[in-house]
Amino acid sequence: KLRPMDCYKETAPGELTNCVGHDDLMMLMFTSGTTGRSKGVMLSERNMCASLHTYSEVAENWIITRLPAGQKLPLSHMTLLPLFHMACFVCVMSYPPAGWALNLCGDIRDFYRDLGLMHSDVMASAPMLVETIYNDMKRGRVSRLNGLWDLCCSSAALDPKMLLELAQNGFVVNQCYGMTETFGDGILNFTQVEKHMSAVGKPDDHVQYKLDETGEICIKGDCVMLGYYKDPEATAEVIDADGWFHTGDLARMDEEGFYYITGRKKNLIILASGENVSPEELEKKLALCPAITECIVKEKSQKICAVIYCPEDKQEEVRAFVIEVNRSLPLYKRISAVEFTVEPLPRNALGKLLRK
């Protein structure tokens, strides 16, 4: 039975008073720590309300306007993301008030079983699972998805070709960008237009966004955290005197206002020549090689090195591909060394590559 959110007032033993302020510490959530140590993010009720306003609008307006033919309300949402991940927490807080069912899958090994038991229309996911669903589609095994049709993905960029094929086969794929430090509030891509498939979308209208002179995304508004727990130095490094939160993510914006993530500021390889190289840019080019399972680009002895995980019998094919990639690059961006690994590259619980 659905009850109004203020129904507790009917049975309250006395007059209700506010016990905390909107800007008091409400919760601590930790960053993923892919490029350094994990930090505790202090968040307030004001931060939460600013973010949930955006995601409730998404649930009520955007997704519902794209219902497949014959689909009835209310919808149901599944997440495999852990509850300590901000994207999962936002889903838990946003969708039930809109009347949606919320399905939680506790173990990715049970994904197809749980999807069969709990029909889900929409799913919040990491890139690796979207790739799995894409492979199911390619193999003609869409029926095992039990009607799942909308995929919301964050954490890392998806291959535009894969996104286009999913869209052409009836899926709605939404890339989005957000951070723990902004209570998940960020940039949302609602378009299914081919030329914008690789964008993370347009910024939330309720928050201020800008790209600084280096191309770093900066955010200002009620969603920005109180600071890092017991770490005023780290807080001062990312929140400037004017209240702008410097995300550390680099992006470009096209003439229509769509943002495209180009890399992480901390990941930039700074060569002795003074040139800056984005490893993510090179990794995207290498990922086009069918023989490469995983790769990561890093600096080693002032050289650009690619660490590649692939079958041993494909190594010569990969070397030849790297040569072709280098021919398309300026001299300072070229990959000087290739290392092969027999083990998958280390990732965190969210599937992000660890660069430490």
Where are these regions (language model features)?
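Conserved pre-ATP/AMP-binding loop-to-beta segment of ANL
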Residues: 11-30, 36-37, 66-76
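AMP-binding/adenylate-forming catalytic core of the ANL superfamily
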Residues: 221, 226-227, 250-333
